[in-house]
Amino acid sequence: WAAYCTGSLPIGACVVDAQGNILSRGRNRIMENQAEVPYACGNTLAHAELNALLAFKADRQVRRAASLYTTTEPCPLCLGAFYMSSIRTLHYAAREPFAGSTNLLGTTPYLSRKPIKVYGPADAELEILITALAVEFERSDGVFHTSSVLQSWQQAIPAGVELGEQL
């Protein structure tokens, strides 16, 4: 929500330990001009997952026991950062049928060597709400900026697109 309120895409992420304690947080900061260190902001690389991972400082043993939670299925950039982070577990609340890239895991020798666990949407209503908020954000100036994105969302999560168009 904080990302949305600052004019960025409404995506957030956090890293938690094995007991569920939050160790770091990040949000999309693409449209923000300032952020405290270590967060990225003001460019197309300032994604929520990347910011949560940049803020996560821990040794390898703690990293391997941690989990990354994120609003939407990570894009190629964020999936790569997650993979490089040594965190072994990923949870996301909504599919991202246009840019989501968890399907890349296991497709190359490099992306096959770590035992990664991925957990996708567990709550269909939450996925609809997340998609609706993303649609509303993209249409906030009256125009959906990428029709292929909307098309992919419409095919995968039609109720979310319909709700987002009503907001």
Predicted regions and their residues:
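Short beta->alpha transition motifs characteristic of CBS
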Residues: N21-M31
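A short, polar/charged loop-to-alpha-helix boundary motif
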Residues: R29-A46
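Short beta-strand scaffold segments in enzyme catalytic cores
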Residues: I11-G20
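Glycine/small-residue-rich phosphate/adenosyl-binding loop
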Residues: I22-S24, H47-Q61
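Local cysteine-cluster metal-coordination motifs and their immediate loop/turn environment
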Residues: T70-R88
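Immediate flanking context of iron-sulfur cluster ligation sites
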Residues: Q61-T72
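Zinc-dependent deaminase
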Residues: W1-T6, S85-L167
